[in-house]
Amino acid sequence: MKQHQQTSIANIKGIGPETEKTLNELGIYDISDLLNYFPYRYDDYELRDLEEVKHDERVTVEGKVHSEPSLTYYGKKRNRLTFRLLVGHYLITAVCFNRPYLKKKLSLGSVVTVSGKWDKHRQTISVQELKNGPHQEDKSIEPVYSVKENVTVKMMRRFIQQALTQYADSLPDPLPEKLRKSYKLPDYYQALKAMHQPETREALKLARRRFVYEEFLLFQLKMQAFRKAEREQTQGIRQRFSNEELMRFIKSLPFPLTNAQSRVLREITADMSSPYRMNRLLQGDVGSGKTAVAAIALYAAILSGYQGALMVPTEILAEQHADSLVSLFEKWDVSVALLTSSVKGKRRKELLERLAAGEIDILVGTHALIQDEVEFKALSLVITDEQHRFGVEQRKKLRNKGQDPDVLFMTATPIPRTLAITVFGEMDVSVIDEMPAGRKRIETYWVKHDMLDRILAFVEKELKQGRQAYIICPLIEESDKLDVQNAIDVYNMLSDIFRGKWNVGLMHGKLHSDEKDQVMREFSANHCQILVSTTVVEVGVNVPNATIMVIYDADRFGLSQLHQLRGRVGRGEHQSFCILMADPKSETGKERMRIMSETNDGFELSEKDLELRGPGDFFGKKQSGMPEFKVADMVHDYRALETARQDAANLVASDAFWKEPEYAVLRDELLKSGVMDGEKLS
């Protein structure tokens, strides 16, 4: 069976050296690659009732020409041909762009078959193909492949047809019969045939469902097997602490815990008291109380006789966290120390000696914590805040400071559940999805750029009451390519307008980290009242006095990033405001502004952002670790993702999966991916 799987594509008639080279560039090397090279779209020539067709979907209809065609020219070579078409009892508009010759083919009352994109709102079809006469039954659903250079779509169809005939029915099916039957999925051969040569929409739908599930299952199996291997290979620290002592500390806090904080805390302390190493992601919106949860977890480590570490991305954030922890542990005989690059000389030497002697219970700091000379006596808990801001190697180095300490990653970036279980699938995920009572909602408004004078008047009104403001711009300097505001121009403009009244600061990514810290210190101390910045303040410090956030060209940002920026205000007792300045051209841009104005819930926004931008853009283009699926879509197929995750967990935990022949193909996939070694899989 495997021989066919790895048979070279050169065995297919018509594939010579040049064609083989082109196919290799498309990632097609053997028969298996060829058969799993699925169409990127299907041209559906099957007649359908327009009532069933979704907006923007491609459709084929047969109808009578109901009006004389009208040809309109605009520009030198551009034109539009429009006519009315009676399809059953629907009277719709058909539009053809830049094909004036079609006018001669159309006559009032004649029957035509048209295919194109359906605009449900305008009851208009944008014609891509038009043929005189009734619909031809022999052409229903045609696959369209992504091709290049000397390989055409027709050639690709021919190559795949040969592969289906000669090899497909002898290839091993990755999905065991038991799983296929439980979800009523077709076998491998049937599914391949339906993907490449669908006879009906229903057959195609079923085949797609099978491959969606298969892709998700394989991915989740790798994740679950990785977790299993980690647990078996790394013996964690079983932390033993008194629940009564921990409850005494919790009751001493100046605020009651929310139900969500209590739930998350139970998950974390259960991990800490187990013999396995904790590897958990803690998600919580800005202001949801992650720091309090972190403090309680750190205290549990101290009660167990160990030390804890908290690593954050910036020096000023480290200082604020350290101050906050010192305040919380004031009456509890807990030693908190701060280590950043600013701690030098004798002070640094003394701190490191105390740390190695076990005299420091909690060490807070930046990447300075991972330097070689930093040694703990007994580190059992590592917490990193805004974990995606650190590289994998940095996180690994900190983890290696102890004997497999428990690790908790915290992020204020609300990550949709579908992405969290995919991108962070090897971790357990905890979510604080509830805000503390009494927290004021940030009022958010979407305005056009021509309202700048009114906005600045509103900003000044707030400044006169002793408040401060952030002004965010998408760029640092002027750009020829983008017509958007830049921070330097806005800084110069505001410095002129408010000269002698208010101090204006400037922060952007080109500043050295020391310079950024200095600017933020001045803003925190209210030495400057207006801070003009790029998105470098997205994850920043706590300035309770800042109550206004003005974002220029807000439609340039995704919802999640806008929400992170908005989270810089609303941290004190005063009412806060976020003003989105934007003149969006696209419907998606307008939709983003509307959603931002209506909701303050970060998780709801992150789900919407995922829908509008897609998974690839959610973390930014350069984000590594995002899996690429051929068929599956994490947003639209999230139910299948959940099912596959549960099935993968059950399989990996069962003896049958590692021994029974029916799971051999799935085990081979794990072996190929390098997640498990051959000994375990044999």
UniProtKB/Swiss-Prot annotation:
Entry annotated with the keyword ATP-binding: yes
E.C. designation(s): 5.6.2.4
Reaction catalysed by this enzyme: Couples ATP hydrolysis with the unwinding of duplex DNA by translocating in the 3'-5' direction; ATP + H2O = ADP + phosphate + H(+)
DEAH box, short sequence motif: residues: 385-388
Compartments (UniProt record): Cytoplasm, Nucleoid
Entry's Gene Ontology molecular function annotations: ATP binding; ATP hydrolysis activity; DNA helicase activity; forked DNA-dependent helicase activity; four-way junction DNA binding
Activity regulation information from UniProt: Replication fork regression on Holliday junctions (HJ) is inhibited by DisA; DisA inhibits the ATPase activity of RecG.
Domain annotation Helicase C-terminal: ranges: 451-611
Gene deletion effect: Decreased viability with a cell proliferation defect and an increase in anucleate cells, very sensitive to DNA damaging agents 4-nitroquinoline-1-oxide, methylmethane sulfonate and mitomycin C. RecD2 is synthetically lethal with recG.
Main location: cytoplasm
Keywords (A to Z) from UniProt: ATP-binding, Cytoplasm, DNA damage, DNA recombination, DNA repair, DNA-binding, Helicase, Hydrolase, Isomerase, Nucleotide-binding
Positions of ATP binding: 284-291
GO biological process: DNA recombination; DNA repair; replication fork reversal
Residues covered by the Helicase ATP-binding domain: 271-432
Spans annotated as Wedge domain: 46-139
GO cellular component: cytoplasm; nucleoid
PROSITE patterns assigned: HELICASE_ATP_BIND_1, HELICASE_CTER
Subunit and interaction comment: Monomer. Interacts with SSB (sbbA), via the latter's 6 C-terminal residues. Colocalizes with DNA pol III subunit gamma/tau (dnaX).
Family the UniProt entry places it in: Belongs to the helicase family. RecG subfamily.
Function: Critical role in recombination and DNA repair. Helps process Holliday junction intermediates to mature products by catalyzing branch migration. Has a DNA unwinding activity characteristic of a DNA helicase with 3'-5' polarity. Unwinds branched duplex DNA (Y-DNA), Holliday junction (HJ) DNA and partially replicated forks as well as catalyzing fork reversal/regression. Does not seem to unwind R-loops. Inhibits the diadenylate cyclase (DAC) activity of DisA in the presence but not absence of HJ DNA, possibly by relocating DisA from the junction.
Comment field on protein domains: The wedge domain within the N-terminus inserts into the replication fork junction, where the lagging and leading strand split.
Record-given protein name: ATP-dependent DNA helicase RecG
Source organism per UniProt: Bacillus subtilis (strain 168)
